[in-house]
């Protein structure tokens, strides 16, 4: 623990206290904070001026990051017949229907993303209580309930990130690896922020983004200029 604390203190020296960073500065600085023995994830944290207890202030959706997430994503698809064939052809790792649901009921879930065709959502509903808490329940808002299973598989494989505001109005997401180039990180972060701004509820009044910051898996956070964040459209 002492070793970790000492390392963290050293990293803190690289971040100017009370400074608000523009995006370019933040990305340049964040890359100097890599200190772990693995390729750390670049994470964004946003505090939005919304009250998600009200349905008209929920912020939820998905976006495909141009440079991907840097992760290998295992995709499962609940589909039958021609749609099952399409999913397999698109590169889905697991494809099935009743037997796949039975596996989920047994706790066998060797996937990171689950996609389903609308006509089989009744079947998926049988395991909703298992999938829901794990964030794996297919949902039309994230493009995981669809007849276009091939596109959904491609999106998931190529870096789709789902986002949903929590009860306190926060959104967290991993937007790539610290080994990515500055250009790749800038593109990913900008694309994600634009998606958040696009989903601004009409019921949200005043400053939409109250706080924004970047960090690595094991680093201090860097405060972002919220006006610059809100100006990304």
Swiss-Prot record:
GO terms for cellular component: cytosolic large ribosomal subunit. It comes from the Bacteria. CDD domains: Ribosomal_L1. Keywords: Repressor, Ribonucleoprotein, Ribosomal protein, RNA-binding, rRNA-binding, Translation regulation, tRNA-binding. InterPro entries: Ribosom_uL1_bac-type, Ribosomal_uL1, Ribosomal_uL1-like, Ribosomal_uL1/biogenesis, Ribosomal_uL1_3-a/b-sand, Ribosomal_uL1_CS. One of its GO terms (molecular function) is structural constituent of ribosome. Gene3D superfamilies: 3.30.190.20, 3.40.50.790. HAMAP family: Ribosomal_uL1_B. Belongs to the universal ribosomal protein uL1 family. Binds directly to 23S rRNA. The L1 stalk is quite mobile in the ribosome, and is involved in E site tRNA release. This is Large ribosomal subunit protein uL1. It comes from Campylobacter curvus (strain 525.92). The gene is rplA.
């Amino acid at each position: 623990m002492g070793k970790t604390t000492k390392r963290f203190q050293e990293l803190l020296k690289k971040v100017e206290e009370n400074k608000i960073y523009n995006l370019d500065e933040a990305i340049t600085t964040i890359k100097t904070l890599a200190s772990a023995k693995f390729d750390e994830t670049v994470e964004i944290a946003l505090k939005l001026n919304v009250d998600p207890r009200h349905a008209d202030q929920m912020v939820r959706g998905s976006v495909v990051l141009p440079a991907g997430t840097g992760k290998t994503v295992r995709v499962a698809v609940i589909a039958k017949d021609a749609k099952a064939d399409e999913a397999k052809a698109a590169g889905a790792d697991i494809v099935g229907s009743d037997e796949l649901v039975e596996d989920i009921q047994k706790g066998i879930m060797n996937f990171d993303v689950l996609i389903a065709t609308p006509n089989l959502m009744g079947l998926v509903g049988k395991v909703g209580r298992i999938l829901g808490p794990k964030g794996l329940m297919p949902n039309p808002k994230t493009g995981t309930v669809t007849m276009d299973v091939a596109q959904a598989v491609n999106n998931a494989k190529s870096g789709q990130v789902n986002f949903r505001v929590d009860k306190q109005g926060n959104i967290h997401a991993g937007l790539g690896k610290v080994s990515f180039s500055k250009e790749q990180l800038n593109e990913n972060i900008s694309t994600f922020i634009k998606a958040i701004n696009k989903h601004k509820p009409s019921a949200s009044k005043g400053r939409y983004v109250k706080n924004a910051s970047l960090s690595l898996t094991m680093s201090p956070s860097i405060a972002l200029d919220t006006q610059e964040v809100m100006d990304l459209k």
